[in-house]
């Protein structure tokens, strides 16, 4: 007797998201966006769209890495900090959200024409955020 394996159709975006209770909706949407090259808005609007097998395999690999402790920012290759997108990898410290307070406090205290030296602070996100927000301040 020849028994053929019954194939299961890949899930829709929404079905995949609902099957991942350990991930937040944001985490799911960001991973879906990565494998589909779609914005989060497009993911939400097209929630009934079906994943193809390549996308599903890539999502499964990303989920395994995430569950083993790889930061989401490393999987995505970027992290937003103070409204700016920074490329990140395991070779770069991921800018932390609470560090945005340091930028806010610095911006309040720095006057135009002053110079700031950023030395050995990790990714440089603090310096870039200050320079972006206060263009008349010299940041090195």
Range-by-range predicted roles:
Residues 98-140:
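Conserved SAM/SAH cofactor-binding pocket of Class I
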